[in-house]
């Protein structure tokens, strides 16, 4: 734990030392005695959290409007941070993580559990009815990924998750993972009741992790029109899409990790609202998928694909871009000047897009492969940046990946959704642990009821 003196804490908060002491007396901050002296010290993380809360309060203004419009945070989370143009998962640089990690490793970080728990999925590995799944899949194989997932998840998840509940590991198996999971430590001197409670805690935690790992695989298989597998998600998608080059398979891995979470976006807020009601986890994930489908969220990749198609047919790229800018300027959301460009949270450019596009360029250069599709994609990005000063977002990068690798239509959306399921699960688990019902209020602006 990093420690601060009273002067250091006051400076970080931008207040006087007497005001700092007032915060302590009001319970907003805690001080701790230094055993070597009479001085008190402060936990740096706690001070920084209070500083962020004060900053949020100062800029709250008309909270009812701004909290729902890229404004003041509406709830607290320890999962993902977006600040100063950087994206972090539980304090780790998500961009650096994506260069080497699998989605399962990112999920283990987001879910705060050992990697082995994410990889386990006992239902998929031991008792999954593949023939029954294929029968359902045949009915939906020709439908878009989202429709297929929304149909198959409710049909298969309840049976799968009841099976995981019967296969929860024993307390003896779970005990070595106490620290990694952040579970309450076992007290050797605890009485029998406390021991039984701890055992129940472990079992509930294990059941939730089995449920989460199973849902990750069911969602992936439904989106990709494949059979659920314990293989890493990027390899499952590569097999479904017949991607064989190891460099290209690596690009799928990078994309999934970059999409794993992005703080409190519309789909994640939907997931948290559903989870707060006590609904089943698969219900929260299904709600997230429905929200993700919107053209201003995960469905943005489909609009980018249409933009790329038009650019490929255009005789004059600059005139095409100007016409598209004029067309999108008529949309209700003035920020949506062109799909796939300019992210409000990244004024200097979306780092996720930068990494994925650079990795795509490097993968093709490594095998000296010419790609008219990539050349056209990069030309469009340059033309838009020249016209608007806007840089590509992750939606554009995913569409570029789909187009360059000749993946099936909708693959960009599938990558976005399959990766984001890991983050949704993390948020659902965090919301369940919080135990509060999310119930915002609306400010009525209609006609008053006549007296």
Indicate residue ranges for each PLM-predicted region.
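Hydrophobic alpha-helical bundle cores within soluble ligand-binding/oligomerization subdomains
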Residues: 2-189, 197-451
């Amino acid at each position: 734990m990093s420690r601060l003196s009273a002067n250091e804490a006051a400076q970080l908060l931008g207040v006087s030392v007497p005001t700092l002491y007032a915060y302590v007396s009001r319970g907003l901050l805690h001080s701790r005695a230094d055993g070597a002296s009479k001085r008190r010290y402060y936990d740096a993380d706690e001070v920084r959290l209070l500083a962020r809360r004060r900053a949020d309060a100062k800029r709250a203004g008309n909270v009812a409007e701004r909290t729902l419009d890229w404004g003041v945070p509406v709830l607290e989370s320890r999962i993902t941070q977006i600040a100063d143009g950087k994206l972090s998962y539980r304090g780790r640089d998500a961009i650096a993580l994506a260069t080497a990690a699998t989605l399962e490793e990112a999920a283990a970080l987001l879910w705060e559990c050992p990697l082995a728990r994410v990889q386990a999925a006992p239902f998929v590995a031991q008792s999954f009815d593949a023939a029954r799944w294929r029968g359902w899949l045949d009915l939906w194989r020709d439908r878009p990924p989202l429709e297929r997932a929304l149909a198959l998840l409710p049909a298969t998840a309840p049976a799968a998750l009841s099976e995981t509940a019967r296969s929860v590991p024993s307390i003896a198996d779970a005990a070595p993972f106490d620290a990694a999971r952040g579970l309450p430590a076992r007290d050797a001197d605890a009485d029998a009741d406390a021991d039984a409670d701890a055992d129940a805690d472990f079992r509930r935690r294990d059941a939730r992790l089995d449920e989460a790992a199973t849902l990750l695989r069911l969602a992936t298989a439904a989106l990709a029109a494949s059979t659920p597998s314990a293989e890493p998600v990027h390899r499952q998608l590569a097999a479904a899409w017949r991607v064989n080059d190891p460099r290209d398979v690596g690009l799928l891995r990078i994309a999934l990790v970059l999409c794993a979470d992005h703080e409190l976006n519309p789909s994640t807020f939907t997931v948290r609202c559903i989870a707060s009601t006590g609904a089943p986890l698969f219900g929260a994930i299904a709600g997230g998928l429905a929200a993700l489908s919107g053209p201003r969220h995960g469905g943005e990749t489909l609009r980018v694909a249409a933009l790329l198609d038009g650019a490929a047919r255009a005789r004059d790229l600059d005139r095409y871009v100007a016409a598209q800018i004029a067309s999108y300027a008529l949309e209700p959301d003035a920020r949506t000047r062109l799909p796939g460009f300019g992210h409000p949270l990244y004024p200097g450019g979306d780092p996720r897009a930068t990494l994925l596009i650079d990795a795509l360029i490097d993968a093709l250069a490594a095998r000296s492969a010419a790609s008219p599709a990539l050349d056209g994609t990069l030309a469009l990005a340059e033309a838009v940046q020249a016209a608007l000063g806007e840089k590509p977002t992750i939606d554009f990068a995913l569409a570029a990946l789909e187009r360059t690798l000749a993946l099936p239509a909708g693959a960009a959306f599938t990558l976005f959704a399959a990766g984001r399921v890991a983050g949704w699960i993390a948020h659902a688990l965090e919301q369940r642990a919080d135990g509060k019902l999310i119930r915002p209020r609306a400010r009525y602006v209609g006609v008053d009821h006549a007296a």
